[in-house]
Amino acid sequence: MAKILVLYYSMYGHIETMAHAVAEGAKKVDGAEVIIKRVPETMPPEIFAKAGGKTQNAPVATPQELADYDAIIFGTPTRFGNMSGQMRTFLDQTGGLWASGALYGKLGSVFSSTGTGGGQEQTITSTWTTLAHHGMVIVPIGYAAQELFDVSHVRGGTPYGATTIAGGDGSRQPSQEELSIARYQGEYVAGLAVKLNG
């Protein structure tokens, strides 16, 4: 049995929705145990609520538990072309895992959300830097998801990982195509994890 963690941060719910689609795809793979968790919120509750943050039911992960998984699929919104501060704060607490090599050889993949032109690909590839320092095997999705070839309308999705275009005010929710790419990413990573660890 390969253990897959879908680990995310979501302020307004876009990445939360994508995380559930990633997990749905991963659960299609026989021999994959899939768990969804989120990183802790770093904003004071009153500021989070005032900013319109969405309450989420996923349990909160601890940095130490990352070593328990065979694959980790990280989801983060874009903040100035990088991962969110909450995800950065969480990953900055993994120094002990780095020192012991606890994540070495584990699969790592990333999905993201952003406004149009907000840096979705840069967010994914800059997150890969942290995964590389841990010795994780980085898993992009390439162009195997056919939705990536549809240019008839605005949508997220890259060869690096699933994305959604949230729009400047956050009103645009993930489209069915974007969710399909996210499901593909989950299924693809889980399939590799089972082959390597199942």
UniProtKB/Swiss-Prot annotation:
Q: Where is the Flavodoxin-like domain?
A: 4-189
Q: Where does FMN bind?
A: 10-15, 78-80, 113-118, 133
Q: Show the catalytic activity.
A: a quinone + NADH + H(+) = a quinol + NAD(+); a quinone + NADPH + H(+) = a quinol + NADP(+)
Residues that coordinate or bind NAD(+): 12
Q: What class of enzyme is it?
A: oxidoreductase
> InterPro entries of this UniProt entry?
Flavodoxin/NO_synth (IPR008254), Flavoprotein-like_sf (IPR029039), Flavoprotein_WrbA-like (IPR010089), FMN_Rdtase-like_dom (IPR005025), NQO (IPR037513)
Disulfide bond positions: none
Binding of substrate: at which residues?
Answer: 98
Q: Could you state a single Gene Ontology molecular function term?
A: FMN binding
Q: Which cofactor does it need?
A: FMN
Tell me which PANTHER family the record gives: FLAVODOXIN-RELATED PROTEIN WRBA-RELATED, FLAVOPROTEIN-LIKE PROTEIN YCP4-RELATED
HAMAP family listed in its UniProt record: NQOR
Q: What is this protein called?
A: NAD(P)H dehydrogenase (quinone)
